[in-house]
Curated annotation (Swiss-Prot):
Species this protein is from: Halalkalibacterium halodurans (strain ATCC BAA-125 / DSM 18197 / FERM 7344 / JCM 9153 / C-125)
Disulfide bridge partners, by residue number: none
Role description: Phosphorolytic 3'-5' exoribonuclease that plays an important role in tRNA 3'-end maturation. Removes nucleotide residues following the 3'-CCA terminus of tRNAs; can also add nucleotides to the ends of RNA molecules by using nucleoside diphosphates as substrates, but this may not be physiologically important. Probably plays a role in initiation of 16S rRNA degradation (leading to ribosome degradation) during starvation.
Signal peptide: none
One of the record's GO molecular function terms: tRNA nucleotidyltransferase activity
Transmembrane segments annotated in the record for this chain: none
GO annotation, biological process: rRNA catabolic process; rRNA processing; tRNA processing
Domain of life, per lineage: Bacteria
Keywords, ordered alphabetically: Nucleotidyltransferase, RNA-binding, rRNA processing, Transferase, tRNA processing, tRNA-binding
UniProt-listed Enzyme Commission number(s): 2.7.7.56
Protein name: Ribonuclease PH
Family that this chain belongs to: Belongs to the RNase PH family.
Main EC class the enzyme belongs to: transferase
Keyword match RNA-binding: yes
């Protein structure tokens, strides 16, 4: 039995509260277990220099943690005057992941800024950020469509992420909390689309190796968990989720034509 009495293939309790903040085009408070992240999506009517004049948009992300999101206070990176390598890695991961499920030509020369602020951390902050950021992005695109900023729905699949690992006593487990992550022999972050395709795999052995069969086992756990997370996204988005399904079907028909 796991520390919190979950089954090996069981996610922590999930809550997705949409429109959590007043000002952003899209905002979400997502809670997975004791990990809580505020995710926002903001539109800016310009793009990075390398995209100017091409008629397409861009998605980029920033990620941070409140000083007391963790058990011991961490100094703000703005106070240090330097963004850590970990933060840079996570920001790039979030941006890459979201760009995989959107047609950037359909948003015009605009940048969508994704901000993920961890207000409480208990493992899985990057995967929770990606899962929440997708919902915030969808809300922002719905608002942009409604006010005429964009003419066509751009998101063509769902996107979510989860952690999996191998515990020395329990074997393969899904959605690790911080304490489980600290003692895991193997841990992996998996980002997948609604079609079940991989966007990113980040896996390492912690003073241990893992076999091909173990890899298949934890990937199967991730697949199960991400399907459940996408259902939670659907529930949170309501009718907006239908737009994603319609765009996915249209893209499929175009690829088969």
């Amino acid at each position: 039995m796991r520390m919190d009495e979950r089954k090996a293939d069981e996610l922590r309790p999930i809550s997705i509260e949409i429109n959590y903040l007043h000002h952003p085009e899209g905002s979400v408070l997502i809670s997975i277990g004791n990990t809580k992240v505020i995710c926002t999506a903001s539109l800016e009517d310009r793009v990075p220099p390398f995209l100017r004049g091409q008629g397409k948009g861009w998605i980029t992300a920033e990620y941070s943690m409140l000083p007391r999101a963790t058990e011991q206070r961490n100094m703000r990176e703005s106070t240090r005057g330097k963004v850590s390598g970990r933060t840079m890695e996570i920001q790039r991961l979030i941006g890459r992941a979201l760009r995989s499920i959107i047609d950037l030509d359909k948003i015009g020369e605009r940048t969508v800024w994704i901000d993920c602020d961890v207000i409480q951390a208990d493992g899985g902050t990057r995967t929770t950020s990606i899962t929440g950021a997708f919902v915030a992005l969808s809300l922002a695109m719905e608002k942009a469509l409604a006010n005429g900023a964009i003419q066509e729905w751009p998101i063509d699949d769902f996107l979510a992420a989860v952690s999996v690992g191998i515990d020395p006593k329990l074997g393969a487990i899904l959605d690790l909390c911080y304490a489980e992550d600290a003692q895991a022999e193997v841990d992996m972050n998996v980002v997948m689309t609604g079609k079940g395709e991989y966007v990113e795999l980040q896996g390492t052995g912690e003073e241990a190796t893992f076999s091909h069969n173990q890899l298949l086992t934890i990937l199967a756990l991730a697949d199960k968990g991400i399907k459940q997370l996408i259902e939670e996204q659907r529930n949170a988005l309501g009718a907006i989720a239908n737009r994603v399904d319609e765009a996915k079907q249209k893209k499929k028909e175009q690829s088969e034509a």
